[in-house]
Structures are given as structure tokens and as C-alpha cells.
Amino acid sequence: QAAGAHGVLLMTSDPHSSEYLPAYYNSLPFFSGFTGENSTLVVTLTGSALWCDGRFYVQGDRQLAGTEIECMHAGSAGVPTVEEYLTAHFAAGQTLLLDGSCVPATIANGYAAALAKSGAKLESKDIVSPLWESLTTRPSLPNTPCELLTVEQTGATAAQRIAMVRDELKKAGATALAVTGLDCVGWLTNMRARDLPCTPLAVAYALVTMDSCTLFIAPGRLNDADAKTLADNGVSLRDYPELIDTVHA
């Protein structure tokens, strides 16, 4: 309400489109009490609804019982989709907020189209992070030690893989690639960590241009020897949050 919006949408998602989220990005359990996966929460000034898939129908019903949040069994007969709900519950001139960095463009565009049917609009604004941090201690970003695998383990150096990416950029008529998937960052740099359960990846981005490659990762996560190996392979280091500003520059 303070942001001048009628509602906000939260998804089980992060800026890397990860299947398993770092606790830092997993806001849905805190705001809804629902601890399942692959869910979407819409909170408006007049009501709330959470969509979960068939694995979590029973869990959702139990965890949301006694709250104002309606548990939507996604895919069941008679249950509206998120898009149908938005069209029905937003009127002309009203706004839905979401954190655009954590919602894929194709999905966000679908929400925008659904809102437009009733004259409402979508706006990318993160109101969840400041609210979360004002109410409790938000989990920190993962900070497990990172290490580089050897070329004997991976079959190619980071420099060779960067060259492969540049060849593909030329074919596509492009000049840069923002690498956001954690598995893709790991493949490109040969870097591994333990930031996610059962997944040997580090929370990081990479940006490949025709003359540079930058790894965006929290300072201190790589030891000096591995940082030098990356530098020798043409990879420079910048802090994790600096990707957007770097792209804009």
C-alpha cells in the first residue's frame, strides 16, 4: 500500500533460475508459512492466494489453514491460473509489483498481458527484500569456499571455453553474453563450491564480451592461486552485485 500498488507477486525463484534456492532468495516460507517448492504467491490489498503443484496440495492445505492465503491446487479443474486470477482481481489503473530480477521475462510478460486485460499494469520493484530485512534477520548469501577443477578433470580450460562462447557470439551476431545460470558459470570457469545442497555450484554471474570475461562473485571466495589461474585465463573478478551496473555501462 505504501508503494502505491494493489498487490505483489512472489515466486520460488532467484536471479539464476535455480531449481534449488539459496535461503537468501527463498522468501516464500517467511511470508506465507508454506515450505514447499515451485510455488507462486499473490498478495493484494483484499486477499491472497498461493499456487502449488500436485506434490504439495496436502502440505499447502495444512500449512495455509487458518491464514487468509487461499491454497490454489495448480492444474486442478476449476482452479484459476495465476494469470486468470490477476485478470479477475486487478482493476484498471491498479499495479502489481514483482522483483523483475527473479522472474523470467517470458513469465513476467504473461503476467503483464493478463493484467492488461483489465487495464492494470505490472511494475518491477523489489519491496520484499527491505520488508524481510526490517522484520527479521534475513539469511546471508552462501559463502562456501570455491575451488577450480583441473583441466584433467574438466577437459578444457576456462580460456578455451570462453573462446567457444565468443565463436557462438559471432555466429549469432552478438557481442556479449551474460551468464546467469549457476551451472553455466561453473562450466565456463571450472569453478565449484557448495552453496546449494547436493549441488556443487557457487552463487555467481559471468559476463563474456569479445575482449573480456568477468566473474561476479563475493570477494574472498577464491584463494590467491585460483584467482591467478582465472586471471591467466582472461577472467577478471568483480563483486557479485555489480553485474547490472557493468552491463548498463
Which residue stretches match the model-derived regions?
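N-terminal accessory/capping or targeting/presequence segment of soluble
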Residues: 1-90, 103, 107-248
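Acidic beta-strand-to-loop metal/phosphate-binding motif
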Residues: 94-101
